[in-house]
């Protein structure tokens, strides 16, 4: 809510298209979560796009390697505790494989250890996807610059709210 107005920010993002279809559509999770999740190749997350590219390319490890790389996260704030669609990514000499594509969500009633929240994993049933490594890396290289060209209205996304001085974005 922004005053008396409820906001529904528009989030533009680059989607994963496999044989012309969205991964959300293929995973059958799209019907439930399609409006609620986006990739990190998005206008609100443009500063995270290079790191996301590196996770997808296998150059950096995801925060939770046992769950895989989060492909889609919350459209509002990118918080993984809202749930996310993830895949285990294996990079080989000539191919890149996405396996165990699953919806991961917090198990608020599950056991916790060391302050961590347990995550429940719901497999989508998708077969592993194998990509040609050269084509895959070419697509990732093109993605980051394209994110900067996506439309983004900061006021619409954040709302007309008071910003604390540390949120002004000034650099000293």
PLM feature spans:
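Intrinsically disordered, low-complexity acidic regions enriched in Pro/Ser/Thr
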Residues: 1-172
């Amino acid at each position: 809510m922004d005053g008396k107005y409820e906001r529904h920010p528009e989030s533009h993002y680059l989607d994963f298209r496999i044989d012309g279809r969205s991964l959300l559509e293929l995973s059958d999770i799209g019907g439930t979560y399609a409006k609620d999740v986006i990739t990190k190749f998005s206008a609100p997350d443009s500063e995270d796009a290079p790191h996301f590219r590196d996770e997808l390319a296998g150059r950096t490890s995801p925060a939770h390697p046992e769950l895989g790389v989060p492909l889609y996260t919350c459209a509002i704030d990118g918080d993984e505790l809202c749930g996310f669609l993830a895949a285990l990514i294996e990079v080989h000499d000539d191919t890149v494989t996405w396996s165990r594509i699953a919806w991961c969500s917090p198990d608020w009633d599950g056991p916790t250890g060391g302050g961590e929240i347990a995550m429940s994993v719901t497999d989508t049933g998708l077969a592993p996807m194998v990509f040609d490594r050269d084509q895959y890396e070419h697509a990732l290289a093109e993605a980051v610059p394209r994110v900067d060209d996506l439309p983004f209205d900061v006021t619409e996304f954040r709302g007309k709210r008071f910003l604390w001085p540390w949120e002004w974005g000034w650099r000293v």
